């Protein structure tokens, strides 16, 4: 019986030690002042559910912004690609016109067909 009372006394002493840890002497010597705590004026004002909801809304907005940005980038790339194709076509046309000045029309047509076949095979 005495062993159970001593164990309850030791557990209560351990609990009090865990709760109130002695801080020791203050460096500045003002032991009569209360120990300072972290200044958090905003803590506890907004609930966790509200913060979680705000985060969710922010994530949705970010996703929408990313979607719009990607869409805009895709449109830009499409325009650039179309412009490159147009320039390449124009360049090829000019090259054939230059060839036509020097060669006969029928021969230029044959070369065109031959080059198109090679393009199809290579691509």
Swiss-Prot record:
Pfam family, one: Cgr1
Composition-biased stretches (Basic residues): 103-123
Region feature (Disordered): 1-47, 85-123
Keywords in alphabetical order: Coiled coil, Nucleus, Ribosome biogenesis, rRNA processing
Feature: compositional bias, Basic and acidic residues: 85-102
A GO CC term attached to the entry: nucleolus
Coiled-coil ranges from the UniProt annotation: 49-110
Major localization class: nucleus
Biased composition (Low complexity): 1-13
GO BP terms: rRNA processing
InterPro entries: Cgr1-like
Localization per Swiss-Prot or TrEMBL: Nucleus, Nucleolus
Function (record text): Involved in nucleolar integrity and required for processing of the pre-rRNA for the 60S ribosome subunit.
UniProt similarity note: Belongs to the CGR1 family.
Protein name per the record: rRNA-processing protein cgr-1
């Amino acid at each position: 019986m005495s062993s159970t009372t001593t164990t309850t006394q030791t557990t209560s002493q351990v609990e009090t030690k865990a709760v109130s840890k002695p801080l020791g002497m203050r460096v500045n010597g003002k032991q009569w002042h209360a120990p300072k705590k972290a200044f958090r004026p905003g803590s506890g004002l907004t609930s966790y559910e509200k913060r979680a909801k705000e985060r969710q809304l922010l994530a949705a907005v970010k996703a929408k912004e990313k979607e719009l940005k990607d869409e805009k980038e895709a449109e830009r790339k499409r325009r650039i690609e179309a412009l490159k194709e147009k320039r390449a076509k124009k360049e090829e046309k000019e090259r054939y016109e230059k060839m036509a000045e020097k060669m006969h029309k029928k021969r230029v047509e044959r070369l065109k067909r031959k080059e198109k076949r090679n393009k199809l095979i290579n691509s």
